[in-house]
Regions:
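Short solvent-exposed beta->alpha transition segments
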Residues: 98-146, 153-157
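N-terminal low-complexity, Pro/Thr-rich disordered segments
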Residues: 31, 36-77, 192-198
Length: 199
C-alpha cells in the first residue's frame, strides 16, 4: 500500500517537467532562428561579404547607388558616420546636386571647385556598386576609407587614360573632422586611384 501515495506525487511533477522541456525547446528554436537570420539582417543594414558588380550586365551598370560595407568596415566605430557621408557624396554626384556635394567635402576642397567646373566634371557620371572595404583611424585623428565603386559616363568624360563608358574604381578617401563633422578631404597630390574597364 505505500506505493499508492507516491503515484499522485509523480503525476504532479510530470506537468511542470513537461512545461520546462517545452519552454526550453521553444526558446531554443527562437534562438536558433535569430542566429540563422543574422546574415539577412546584416544585408538589410548594408553589410555584405562580397562585391557583386562584376556580375552585372552592361545595361545594369553601375549597379545600386546604395553604399554598402564589408563586415570589417561595418565594425569600425565610425562606420555609420562614414556610410552617411559617402551616401550623400554619391547621391550628390548622381543627382548633379552641387550644393549637397559641398556639404560632404572640406571647405577648402569646395572652394577649389566651382559649380561650373563640378557640373562639367560630372555631367554624364552615374556611380553605383559602392563598397567600403575598410575604415582606418590615422594617428593624426583623421580617417581613411578604402572603397570601390563603378562609374558609367560618356566615354569622353572618363579618365584621360581610360575613356570607357564603364570604369571600376578602387581608392582611399581621406576624411577629416571639420566643425565636428566628418568631411571628405582632397586626395593627396600625385595619388592615382586604381581604375579599370568594367568586365
Amino acid at each position: 500500500m505505500p506505493a499508492s501515495p507516491l503515484a499522485p506525487a509523480r503525476g504532479r511533477w510530470l506537468v511542470p517537467a513537461l512545461i520546462v522541456v517545452v519552454s526550453l525547446t521553444v526558446g531554443g528554436g527562437l534562438l536558433a532562428r535569430e542566429v540563422y537570420r543574422k546574415p539577412d539582417a546584416a544585408a538589410d543594414t548594408g553589410v555584405i561579404a562580397t562585391r557583386t558588380s562584376q556580375s552585372l550586365a552592361p545595361e545594369q551598370q553601375p549597379g545600386s547607388p546604395v553604399v554598402e560595407m564589408t563586415p570589417d568596415a561595418a565594425a569600425h566605430p565610425h562606420a555609420d558616420g562614414v556610410r552617411a557621408l559617402l551616401q550623400n557624396y554619391f547621391d550628390a554626384i548622381n543627382a548633379r546636386n552641387y550644393e549637397l556635394w559641398k556639404t560632404t567635402v572640406t571647405k577648402l576642397r569646395a572652394q577649389a571647385k566651382s559649380k561650373v567646373e563640378w557640373e562639367a566634371d560630372y555631367r554624364s557620371t552615374k556611380d553605383g556598386s559602392i563598397l567600403v572595404y575598410r575604415i582606418e583611424a590615422m594617428g593624426d585623428g583623421t580617417l581613411q576609407s578604402l572603397i570601390g565603386f563603378t562609374s558609367t559616363q560618356d566615354p569622353q568624360d572618363g579618365p584621360v587614360d581610360l575613356q570607357e563608358p564603364c570604369v571600376r574604381w578602387h581608392l582611399t578617401l581621406p576624411m577629416v573632422l571639420e566643425n565636428g563633422m566628418w568631411k571628405l578631404d582632397a586626395i593627396p597630390a600625385g595619388t592615382t586611384p586604381m581604375h579599370e574597364r568594367c568586365t
